[in-house]
Amino acid sequence: MIANGTGIAPFLGMLDFKDTEKHLYCGFRHQTEATNNFTNIARNQINTSLKIGYSRSEMPKYVMDLVNEDELIFVDILQNNGVIMICGSLRMQKDIETTLSKICEKNKLNSIDFYKKEGKILTDCY
């Protein structure tokens, strides 16, 4: 699951599924009480990993940076019939799709369009 800003909302309910391994990557401008609440919710779930980037912090980090850092997790997801869900801004979606395309090419996977057609990369962006 990849989100920025309010795009995290749909994923919060999905965190309750205990039987499925989940990876949540999210980006916000600043660390706030709300982002701390999201962090606490995610960290208290079983089978859930969490990575957060803050784009306006002293050491800015964007969601695409987090995805790049965990390239092999995304390769594993795509190779093993997993699903990548993206929710948030259209700009973030474009950046993430570019990042995933590079990961697919580098690791000799199918194209991102293939995974989208197969329902393995899902987007709900605005």
Which residues does each predicted region cover?
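Active-site beta-strand/loop microenvironment that shapes enzyme catalytic pockets
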Residues: 1-18
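Reductase modules of NAD(P)H-dependent flavoproteins
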Residues: 20-126
